[in-house]
UniProtKB/Swiss-Prot annotation:
Pfam families: TYA
Organism: Saccharomyces cerevisiae (strain ATCC 204508 / S288c) (Baker's yeast)
Span list, region Disordered: 1-97, 129-171, 352-440
Induction statement: Ty1-NL2 is a weakly expressed element. Induced under amino acid starvation conditions by GCN4.
Protein name (Swiss-Prot/TrEMBL): Transposon Ty1-NL2 Gag polyprotein
Length: 440
């Protein structure tokens, strides 16, 4: 009796259970031979209905929602969602397909992980050439890179180079302002050098030392995204990424050029503020130097107006050009070209006066002889003697005798001798007398 009662109630209970099933398959342990044919048909209809309901259900509703991948976008969006950094995966070069998501300007569309969350890139091979970060879970980006001795696999190598395979490379800081981008690039380049990737950094001519590989480009692309958020990038960087969102090498090359340009700007400002000119160099060369500096500064966004430029130029003038400070200081609308017209006029006048002066140069040996012969600065007295003295050389006694004999002759000559000594004495040269000029 009990077995018959169980067999009578079991189909009813089984049928009620089957009516509430909504899964793909109906599982039962009861022998289908114990069920009547009408009940079997009912079971088949219920199973068919359940299958038809499942086919119309969206695939997303059958998958439980992951709370870690919650996205602010709508459910109809089929693009990758923006989730927290620790829950997303590193992007590979093959995944960076423009047809899947947009360029780097929308980083929320590109999944990647922070540098601390995944091992650092190293090329395939038996020995790793690059240090690796430990894959710790939940490490925020603001957490500094491990630097203590406990994080190293070999504590005895604590004083070795940063590029050792048993040490960790300190990541660059996060970019927080577009104005700090060039300074951030310096730290990012240092980060690449410490990671044994210095060969891919563009040089002064804009080309790297060696060709970058696909894996290195992927690492460069991902690390740049992590530490340089798009909202803090300058406009010129966004313009490059809008054309090719993976061209990080071009960004580094342009950054190095801008760094050199900034250094040149500082040098130009210092040169312009310390100008010196005294006519020792041609005026054309001086004008070319100054105008090139002013043009470079104006092209780089540092505008130097005529008033400031003229003041800097006139402050460096010296010599004959110094008076231009006072003749032109009241001309407020004076231009640099007008100032250089005055400088050219003075320079040409100097050159003309130098060419017109005769150039007499004495023999250096004569100057030495003169300095040795004459020590006194006064000119020595020159005595001119009568050339007939050598032919009529007589003694003083003979000349005195002739004078005494001439006094005995009665002539007008005696009267002339007896005249006052203040009058000039005129003697006839009858007796062959020769007097020195200084005896008068």
């Amino acid at each position: 009796m009990e077995s018959q009662q169980l067999s009578q109630h079991s189909p009813i209970s089984h049928g009620s259970a089957c009516a509430s099933v909504t899964s793909k398959e109906v599982h039962t342990n009861q022998d289908p031979l114990d069920v009547s044919a009408s009940k079997i048909q009912e079971y088949d209809k219920a199973s068919t209905k359940a299958n038809s309901q499942q086919t119309t259900t969206p695939a997303s509703s059958a998958v439980p929602e992951n709370p870690h991948h919650a996205s602010p976008q709508t459910a109809q969006s089929h693009s990758p969602q923006n989730g927290p950094y620790p829950q997303q995966c590193m992007m590979t070069q093959n995944q960076a397909n423009p047809s899947d998501w947009s360029f780097y300007g929308r980083p929320s569309m590109i999944p990647y992980t922070p540098y601390q969350m995944s091992p650092m890139y190293f090329p395939p091979g038996p020995h790793s050439q690059f240090p690796q970060y430990p894959s710790s879970v939940g490490t925020p980006l603001s957490t500094p890179s491990p630097e203590s001795g406990n994080t190293f696999t070999d504590s005895s190598s604590a004083d070795s180079d940063m590029t050792s395979t048993k040490k960790y490379v300190r990541p660059p800081p996060m970019l927080t302002s577009p104005n700090d981008f060039l300074n951030w690039v310096k730290t990012y380049i240092k980060f690449l050098q410490n990671s044994n990737l210095g060969g891919i950094i563009p040089t002064v001519n804009g080309k790297p030392v060696r060709q970058i590989t696909d894996d290195e480009l992927t690492f460069l692309y991902n690390t740049f995204q992590i530490f340089a958020p798009s909202q803090f990038l300058p406009t010129w960087v966004k313009d490059i990424l809008s054309v090719d969102y993976t061209d990080i090498m071009k960004i580094l090359s342009k950054s190095i050029e801008k760094m050199q340009s900034d250094t040149q700007e500082a040098n130009d400002i210092v040169t312009l503020a310390n100008l010196q000119y005294n006519g020792s160099t041609p005026a054309d060369a001086f004008e070319t130097k100054v105008t090139n500096i002013i043009d470079r500064l104006n092209n780089n966004g540092i505008h130097i107006n005529n008033k400031v430029a003229c003041q800097l130029i006139m402050r460096g003038l010296s010599g004959e050009y110094k008076f231009l400070r006072y003749t032109r200081h009241r001309h407020l609308n004076m231009t640099v070209a007008e100032l250089f017209l005055d400088i050219h006029a003075i320079y040409e006048e100097q050159q003309g006066s130098r060419n017109s002066k005769p150039n007499y140069r004495r023999n250096p040996s004569d100057e030495k002889n003169d300095s040795r012969s004459y020590t006194n600065t006064t000119k020595p007295k020159v005595i001119a003697r009568n050339p007939q003295k050598t032919n009529n050389s007589k003694s003083k006694t003979a000349r005195a005798h002739n004078v005494s004999t001439s006094n005995n002759s009665p002539s007008t000559d005696n009267d002339s001798i007896s005249k006052s000594t203040t009058e000039p004495i005129q003697l006839n040269n009858k007796h062959d007398l020769h007097l020195r000029p200084e005896t008068y």
